[in-house]
From Swiss-Prot:
This is Photosystem I reaction center subunit XII. Belongs to the PsaM family. The keyword Membrane applies. GO terms for biological process: photosynthesis. GO terms for cellular component: chloroplast thylakoid membrane; photosystem I. It is found in: Plastid, Chloroplast thylakoid membrane. It is a single-pass membrane protein. It comes from the Eukaryota. Keywords: Chloroplast, Membrane, Photosynthesis, Photosystem I, Plastid, Thylakoid, Transmembrane, Transmembrane helix. The chain crosses the membrane at residues 7-29. Its main location: plastid.
Amino acid sequence: MITDFQVYIALMAALLASVLAIRLGATLYQ
């Protein structure tokens, strides 16, 4: 059973991962 809290944590983790990936990509392109 998946709770709303687990969904919230998963969404925040995905958002953080995407932000880190974008920042890493921008750094490499410089």
